[in-house]
Amino acid sequence: MKWLLGAYVCLCLANILNALIPNPCCNVFALNETLIPSIYDINWIYITDPQTCKGVSVAQVFQRRTAQHMSTRYVCSNGFNVISFLLAVLRKLPLNTEEYNFKNRLITLQNSFLSKLGPDTTSAIKFKSKYGQLAKTRNLE
């Protein structure tokens, strides 16, 4: 009985750790606009380097809900679109040194993806990740 309880605890901890570790190469799919998280509800965004997902630009958006009954949600997004959006916002703001460095890093990423743009690097359908499914949500409480 103790080993069963221990296995259950390990399984629960593994699920929590998997939720916290980015699994960036995931299937990007179109969402109904009512399901797209508000920019104000996003806690962090993980954008891949070109070599991470075989040249495909993927961004994983993490939305943790504040209410106890609401679960955490991951959404796989087109990384190039996320980069372009963030750059458009940053270009309109006065930037401090850290934000300026962030903007330059985004420009570097954007240029890297542009230099490798082709049929193989514009589709993330080849990635079959459970975190690319909007329906897969979990409570971390």
Curated annotation (Swiss-Prot):
Q: Where in the cell is it found?
A: Virion membrane; Host cell membrane; Host Golgi apparatus, Host trans-Golgi network
Q: Provide a GO CC annotation, any one.
A: host cell Golgi apparatus
Which InterPro entries does the entry mention? Herpes_gL_rhadinovirus, Herpes_gL_rhadinovirus_sf, HSV_GL_alphagamma
Keywords of the record, alphabetical order, are: Fusion of virus membrane with host cell membrane, Fusion of virus membrane with host membrane, Glycoprotein, Host cell membrane, Host Golgi apparatus, Host membrane, Membrane, Signal, Viral envelope protein, Viral penetration into host cytoplasm, Virion, Virus entry into host cell
Q: Where is this region: Interaction with gH?
A: 21-131
Q: How does it sit in the membrane?
A: Peripheral membrane protein
Entry keyword annotation includes Membrane = yes
May I ask which residue range the UniProt record assigns to the signal sequence? 1-19
**Pfam families membership:** Phage_glycop_gL
Q: Which GO terms describe its biological process?
A: fusion of virus membrane with host plasma membrane; symbiont entry into host cell
Give the chief site where it resides.
virion
Instruction: Explain the purpose of this protein.
Output: The heterodimer glycoprotein H-glycoprotein L is required for the fusion of viral and plasma membranes leading to virus entry into the host cell. Acts as a functional inhibitor of gH and maintains gH in an inhibited form. Upon binding to host integrins, gL dissociates from gH leading to activation of the viral fusion glycoproteins gB and gH.
**Into which family does the record put it?**
Belongs to the herpesviridae glycoprotein L family.
Assembly behavior: Interacts with glycoprotein H (gH); this interaction is necessary for the correct processing and cell surface expression of gH. The heterodimer gH/gL seems to interact with gB trimers during fusion.
**Name the record gives this protein:** Envelope glycoprotein L
Naturally occurring in which organism (per UniProt): Saimiriine herpesvirus 2 (strain 11)
- From the UniProt record, report the name of the gene that encodes this protein: gL
